[in-house]
Design a protein with these regions (language model features):
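Divalent metal-coordination and catalytic microenvironments
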Residues: 10, 25, 46, 57, ...
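Active-site gating loops and adjacent loop-to-helix segments of metal-dependent hydrolytic enzymes
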Residues: 64-104, 181-184, 212, 230-248, ...
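Active-site loop-helix segments enriched in His/Asp/Glu that coordinate
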Residues: 70, 92-180, 188-207
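Active-site core of metal-dependent hydrolases
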Residues: 157-170, 179-299
Length: 300
């Protein structure tokens, strides 16, 4: 049988050297020397061949907008202790004053071509949904999702960056985003002004997710405040709503400041809810305790 592609002398992460046979867009065999011919052949020369990259959290609607962002926003977000995170987000949100759908599509296309070149196969793409961005970012990402459907798997997240309770009109726009075809319900509950409103934020997201049978991805506790508890409420809500294994918590930086007793209880809850955690180590000085999460059996 003629194969489409054979990658010879590939080194797996285990250190094993083997041939990888590809046909009809799928890996057919990983093993010793592959006999027969192939339409294409690559000699990996003993170098590492591994899985494609997955970007689980990317604000794709905002790529290549650095010229619009103020330096003060970056300084606040990366500051010691991350006490100015909310101010940084509010300052950076001014980029949405420049939102034009066609321009977003053009910027995103350039980034996706580069991502594809570097081996990215899947992206969970966040698009701001609020009274400033309205549906512009979502519409742009839905168009680019279709354009790249045979190249990169893109999930569009309807993301209420500026809150739901504190930003009247956003809840309706989230429903409209899902009607347009967004894949995932987003959230950022800690951005709300009170703990009560943070819980309402999460409750609304679950109502929307259940209506559209959609997964949930939220930015939780993304500041240097050890009193933040939205990761806990998100996990308990996943259990209560029967959304086990369908929820992701991104950033969750405040967990780095939790005392050991509470952190262990939180890990047990996250595992029970099968909540995945996205660490985003390239942004901000605080990070989730990755090793502790992995040791607790949580997907990171």
């Amino acid at each position: 049988m003629t194969q489409d592609l054979v990658i010879r002398n590939a080194r797996l992460r285990s250190g094993r050297i083997c041939d990888i046979t590809v046909a009809a867009g799928h890996i057919q065999r990983i093993g010793e020397r592959t006999a027969g011919s192939a339409r294409g052949e690559i000699d990996a020369q003993g170098k590492l061949v591994t899985e494609t990259f997955v970007i689980a959290h990317l604000h794709l609607d905002k790529v290549m907008t650095g010229s619009f962002a103020e330096e003060a926003a970056l300084e606040q977000y990366h500051g010691s202790g991350m006490g100015g995170t909310m101010t940084a987000i509010e300052t950076a949100s001014r980029v949405k004053e420049h939102y034009v759908e066609s321009e977003i599509v053009d910027r995103v296309r350039k980034v996706l071509v580069e991502a594809e070149y570097h081996g990215v196969s899947h992206i969970r793409a966040f698009a701001d949904v609020d009274t400033k961005a309205r549906l512009t970012g979502v519409s742009a990402l839905l168009k680019i999702r279709e354009e790249f459907k045979n190249r990169i798997g893109i999930q569009v997240v309807a993301f209420p960056q500026d809150g739901i309770i504190r930003e009247p009109g956003t809840e309706e726009l989230l429903y409209k985003s899902m009607d347009l075809g967004a894949d995932v319900v987003g959230g950022i509950p800690w951005i709300e002004y009170t703990d009560e409103d943070s819980k309402k934020h999460i409750d609304i997201a679950f109502e929307i997710a259940k209506k559209y049978n959609a997964d949930i991805a939220m930015l939780t506790d993304d500041a240097g405040d050890p009193e933040l508890r939205t990761t806990e409420y998100l996990a308990s809500s996943a259990i209560r709503n029967g959304w086990i294994g369908r929820v992701a918590a991104c950033h969750a930086r405040a967990t780095a400041l939790y005392n050991e007793v509470y952190h262990r209880k939180l890990c047990a809850l996250l595992k029970k809810a099968e909540v995945g955690v996205v660490s985003d180590p390239h942004t901000g000085p605080l990070h989730v305790r990755v090793k502790d999460l992995l040791d607790a059996g949580i997907t990171v």
